[in-house]
Swiss-Prot record:
PROSITE patterns: NUSG (PS01014). The gene is nusG. Disulfide bonds: none annotated. It comes from the Bacteria. This is Transcription termination/antitermination protein NusG.
Length: 176
């Protein structure tokens, strides 16, 4: 019976583990027992200091690969022994199938890919520090954010008066 399982991998090795499982299936002629292998990802926008943007792919569940497989002890041990595979998720060192609700949530999250999100998120009311431009080293409060244009509308307090400014994401940093 085909069930979904979660495999824990070394973080950052999800794609190489997926490829290794695909190769294992092809080499041992067990493709009919492995129905699907997924590494859920999302697109993010990374903005460099020079305001150059690039879309990058980021794992939604770092360190995990999900597999729909007809699993027996032999196949479990073959997958378990692949490089960069830590373990199957389960109880008492035995793999436990994921519930329909869990895998449904994962697949829904994966299929509802929206426009790429910025790597750094700002929220209304959040206090940030301006790191570039005429207001460098000032702290400001986020009033609005424009994801599409990667701009923020901030309120900066200058000489006791609140002044609205518009600034690029790359010109501010979060205060931790």
């Amino acid at each position: 019976m085909m069930d979904w399982y979660a495999i824990q991998t070394y973080s950052g090795s999800e794609q190489s583990v997926k490829k290794a499982i695909e190769n294992l299936a092809n080499d041992h002629d067990i493709r009919d027992r492995i129905q699907e292998i997924i590494v859920p990802t999302e697109d993010i926008i990374e903005v460099s200091k020079k305001s150059k943007t690039k879309v990058m792919e980021r794992s939604l569940y770092p360190g995990y690969v999900f597999i729909k497989v007809d699993l027996d002890t032999v196949l479990w041990h073959k997958i378990q022994s692949l490089p960069r595979v830590s373990r199957f998720i389960g109880e008492n060192k035995k793999p436990t199938p994921l519930s329909e609700a869990d895998i449904g949530h994962i697949l829904e999250k994966m299929n509802n890919r929206a426009a790429p999100k910025p790597k750094i998120f700002f929220e209304q009311g959040e206090v940030v520090r301006v790191v570039e431009g005429p207001f460098a080293n000032f702290t400001a409060t986020v009033e609005e954010y424009d994801v599409e244009h990667r701009k923020l509308k901030l309120n900066v307090s200058i000489f006791g008066r609140t002044t609205p400014i518009e600034i690029l994401y790359s010109q501010v940093e979060k205060i931790i």
